[in-house]
Design a protein with these regions (language model features):
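N-terminal glycine/serine-rich phosphate-binding loop of ATP-dependent small-molecule kinases
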Residues: 1-54, 65, 81, 109, ...
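Carbohydrate-associated surface elements
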Residues: 60
């Protein structure tokens, strides 16, 4: 595929190794765990929960020209008013826009969008959801409505079906 990707499988294997060591040392005293990472990077999943096209990094070069493309679809002032997120090259919104502009078929088949900590939490728990604070970094979340920024999502031409439940931290 080209581009910059995270080796998410290796990261997850390291998490499992760490959990095994913690279990050996602390046993039943561990009652919960959480997944917290950087924001912006995401993975698209199919209906069976399989990754589509890898886990791209925010440094991926495919976003060249996407700020201008986004501006042509919705003024950045309007995006900021809706999301509270300043325009930046690493915004998830631009990367997802690039998926559509470059006709990535993964966007059409995607059943779910999960950000990095949400993907790890899904692999640990089997629950697909988007945690509110990391979702807020995507430039696709409306903090006033406490919901996806549908106006932005629609302006970018992104399929609504892949935007799932948003949950509070610690759930």
């Amino acid at each position: 595929h080209g581009g910059c990707y995270w080796n998410t499988i290796s990261l997850f294997e390291s998490i499992l190794e760490g959990l095994q060591k913690a279990n050996e040392k602390y046993g039943d005293t561990i009652v919960s765990i959480g997944a917290d990472t950087w924001g912006c990077d995401y993975t698209l999943l199919d209906k069976q929960g399989n990754m589509l096209g890898g886990h791209r990094q925010y440094r991926d070069p495919r976003i060249e020209g996407m700020q201008e493309e986004m501006e042509s679809r919705m003024p950045m002032e309007s995006v900021f008013a809706c999301t509270g997120v300043q325009p930046a090259f690493y915004n998830s919104s631009l990367h997802l826009l690039a998926e559509g502009v470059k006709n990535n078929p993964c966007l059409d088949i995607a059943d779910r969008l999960l950000f990095t900590p949400d993907l790890l939490a899904y692999w640990l728990s089997g629950v697909q959801s988007n945690e509110r604070t990391v979702t807020s970094t995507s430039q696709l979340y409306d903090p006033i409505k406490r919901d996806w920024a549908w106006e932005v999502i629609d302006a970018l031409g992104l399929p609504r079906k892949m935007f799932g439940d948003i949950v509070s931290s610690g759930t």
